[in-house]
């Protein structure tokens, strides 16, 4: 009987240790993806961005980060926005120095010089908005 009790206690301790180890490990960051432009806007608003929906931009959001002065346009990435970006690049309307940054589910347009880009990307990454496929939209 005592032998069984000892085994049960040891099993319980082992199980508790495994649970504790599992709860301390963090899953790999996969980024935040959005099902729609509205979901993206809600996420931005709840994460310190001041955002206003602008239907003239095809439902994009003009956003500023709290305390910042730079305006960025966040737009849900769809087939339409991807084809528009490609057309802007080909026509020379889009800045070819990396100001237009695209992810799989969102697009960032800075409207500012290259010196602003690192700070914007740092803020976006710190907020977990990266989706693992951030690329320059123009080569």
Residue ranges and their predicted role:
Residues 1-10:
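Bacterial N-terminal signal peptides that target proteins for export
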Residues 14:
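Active-site-proximal loop/hinge segments that shape catalytic or ion-binding/gating pockets
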Residues 17-20:
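C-terminal motif of bacterial Sec signal peptides marking the signal peptidase cleavage site
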Residues 22-25:
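Bacterial signal peptide processing site
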Residues 29:
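Substrate-binding/charge-relay-adjacent region of secreted/lumenal peptidase catalytic domains
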Residues 32-96:
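Short, solvent-exposed recognition patches
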Residues 75-139:
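Extracytosolic low-complexity repeat regions of secreted or lipid-anchored proteins
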């Amino acid at each position: 009987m005592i032998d069984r009790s000892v085994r049960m206690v040891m099993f319980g301790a082992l199980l508790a240790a495994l649970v504790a180890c599992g709860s301390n490990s963090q899953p790999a960051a996969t980024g935040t993806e959005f099902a729609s432009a509205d979901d993206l806007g809600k996420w931005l608003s709840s994460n310190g961005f001041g955002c206003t929906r602008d239907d003239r931009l095809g439902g994009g959001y003009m956003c500023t980060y709290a305390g910042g002065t730079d305006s960025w346009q966040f737009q849900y990435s769809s087939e339409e926005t991807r084809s528009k970006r490609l057309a802007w690049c080909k026509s020379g309307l889009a800045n070819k120095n990396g100001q237009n940054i695209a992810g799989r589910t969102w697009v960032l347009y800075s409207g500012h010089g290259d010196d602003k880009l690192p700070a914007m990307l740092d803020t976006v990454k710190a907020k977990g908005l990266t989706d693992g496929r951030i690329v320059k939209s123009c080569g």
